[in-house]
């Protein structure tokens, strides 16, 4: 996996206890890799599955298990907060989430500094105002859940405020849960260190400052809580979000839905000082989550650091280190499927910056397939290597498509083979068959959280003169055009669509996609 920006800090400093065990805990919606005891890993996985049940109950979404591992969130649980921060590239990070076409990933600590593995599951009421890694993970999973199930456009304050509301869900022993507890770790900011008004949160078009971004989490949580639980405001939040998605500017949508924003600001300031309401929810037909447990083999443990670094994402500076470390492990475990697959991924990432790595990536994919011929990931990596060759030798593209077709036959719900199959036609410059177009749309449905699919699908829809559909896909980027250069560009594309200039919109979007790829491969920030 690739990223545009990541700290240059190498991930060699992960502190692991001697002879640490690693367990895989698999539930209906999660695959957890945990550096802990088996019981602790199982309890943790059950807790995550219960969070998913709670969110489904709140959003009236059917309880159904994922039928493809690509639809499950993979959670890497290891080390302490310091180790998580080193992997993220930012100190003090207690957990983070990376959406990805081939399967999204989250990272969370398995232990507190100085404590034995697993003690984060123990309640510590003397630490209420400390940042709780469990609540961070609940927050990040709520993002994944929202992006996976809803394609609508949401302003940043609501995305973070809703996730903060869900982060403090209290899971009860009987299977019920409580919604509405305040995030105590935000209390200092809410009661004196932050000066972000409702007007500024909802109506500003200025480039957001660091204080504004803190406001998304704090004032955003407070506003979402108030609009959710205060009887006098019932229905206003839905009205506001509907207006934004219909094309109303966020500032206008806020006034239409909430009225006087100054009055709203005064009301939430009073609201935060009182006793906050909440609700107890009982899940119908609740039964404890089932967990499949498997202890990782020595080769899987040996490649785990490489795998986590790849899943976190690499840039031009880090990719060579990750690939080098993958090769070192592969020398020790030449007949390990897990190791060869991780090596193929690392070399593919490196090939973005060093084309000579492409042959090594394809060779590792071939070895993976020899060890496990039905591996969807190995088939996809093989196809991706051929796809990249096809950028300069178009005769490789039909061959690449055969591998994506095989991967699709093995797992029809995995978005990556569908997406790359479409790209193989697009790069070849031939008429794209209906089956590939449908495949791209299915990939989008399976991976609503992936930003690149959205841009590519919007480009295709514009080529088909389907401006209204393309606009709906781009709106999540366009509603806050001040947040980044890329978001501003998406706003310009949407403006062209709304002006019925669909061809110009497609040209601009295609150029933006190409420019982002060029900058990424050059090791630059694509903005």
Outline where the language-model segments fall.
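Juxtacatalytic substrate-recognition/specificity segment
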Residues: 20-155, 166, 170-172, 202-210, ...
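Beta/coil-rich, acidic/histidine-enriched accessory regions frequently appended to metallopeptidases
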Residues: 246-390, 413, 469-472, 487-527
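TPR/TPR-like alpha-solenoid helical repeat scaffolds
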Residues: 418-427, 459-463, 485-504
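TPR/TPR-like (Sel1-like) alpha-helical repeat modules
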Residues: 402, 462, 467-485
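Acidic/His/Gly-enriched intrinsically disordered linker/tail segments
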Residues: 96-119, 132, 150-294
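Canonical positions in the second alpha-helix
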Residues: 329, 367-368, 406-407, 442-443, ...
């Amino acid at each position: 996996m690739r990223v545009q920006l990541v700290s240059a800090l190498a991930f060699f400093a992960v502190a692991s206890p001697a002879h640490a065990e690693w367990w895989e805990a698999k539930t209906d919606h999660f695959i957890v890799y945990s550096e802990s005891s088996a019981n602790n890993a199982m309890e943790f996985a059950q807790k995550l599955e219960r969070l998913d049940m709670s969110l489904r109950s709140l959003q009236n979404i059917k309880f159904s298990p994922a039928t493809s591992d690509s639809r499950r969130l993979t959670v890497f649980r290891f080390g302490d907060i310091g180790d998580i921060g080193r992997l993220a590239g930012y100190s003090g990070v207690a957990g983070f989430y990376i959406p990805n076409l081939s399967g999204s990933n989250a990272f969370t600590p398995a232990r507190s500094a100085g404590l034995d593995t697993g003690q984060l599951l123990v309640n510590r009421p003397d630490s209420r105002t400390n940042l709780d890694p469990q609540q961070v993970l609940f927050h990040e999973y709520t993002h994944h859940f929202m992006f996976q199930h809803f394609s609508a456009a949401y302003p940043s304050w609501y995305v973070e405020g809703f996730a903060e509301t869900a982060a403090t869900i209290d899971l009860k022993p009987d299977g019920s849960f409580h919604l509405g507890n305040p995030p105590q770790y935000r209390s200092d900011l809410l009661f004196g260190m932050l000066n972000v008004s409702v007007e500024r949160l909802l109506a500003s078009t200025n480039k957001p400052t660091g204080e504004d971004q803190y406001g998304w989490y704090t004032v955003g949580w407070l506003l979402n809580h108030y609009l959710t639980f205060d009887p006098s405001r019932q229905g206003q939040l839905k009205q506001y979000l509907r207006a934004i998605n219909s094309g109303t500017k966020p500032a206008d949508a806020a006034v239409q839905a909430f009225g006087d924003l100054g009055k709203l600001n005064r009301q939430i300031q009073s609201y935060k000082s009182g006793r906050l309401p909440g609700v107890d929810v009982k899940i119908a037909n609740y039964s404890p989550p089932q967990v499949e447990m498997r202890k990782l083999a020595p080769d899987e443990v040996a490649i785990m650091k490489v795998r986590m670094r790849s899943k976190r994402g690499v840039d031009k500076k880090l990719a060579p280190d990750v690939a080098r470390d993958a090769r070192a492990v592969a020398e020790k475990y030449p007949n390990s499927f897990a190791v060869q697959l991780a090596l193929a991924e690392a070399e593919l990432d490196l090939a973005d910056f060093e084309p000579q790595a492409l042959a090594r990536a394809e060779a590792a994919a071939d070895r993976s397939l020899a060890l496990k011929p039905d591996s969807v990931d190995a088939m996809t990596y093989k196809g991706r290597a051929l796809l990249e060759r096809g950028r300069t030798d178009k005769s490789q593209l039909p061959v690449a498509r055969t591998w994506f077709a095989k991967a699709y036959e093995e797992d029809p719900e995995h978005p990556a083979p569908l997406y790359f199959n479409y790209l193989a036609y697009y790069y070849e410059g031939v008429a794209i068959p209906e089956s590939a177009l449908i495949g791209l749309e299915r990939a989008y449905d399976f991976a609503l959280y992936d930003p690149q699919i959205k841009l590519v699908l919007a480009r295709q829809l514009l080529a088909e003169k389907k401006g209204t559909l393309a606009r709906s896909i781009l709106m999540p980027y366009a509603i806050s055009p001040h947040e980044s250069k890329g978001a501003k560009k998406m706003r310009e594309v949407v403006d062209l669509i709304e002006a019925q200039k669909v061809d110009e919109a497609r040209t601009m979007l295609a150029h933006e996609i190409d420019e982002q790829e060029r900058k990424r491969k050059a090791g630059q920030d694509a903005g």
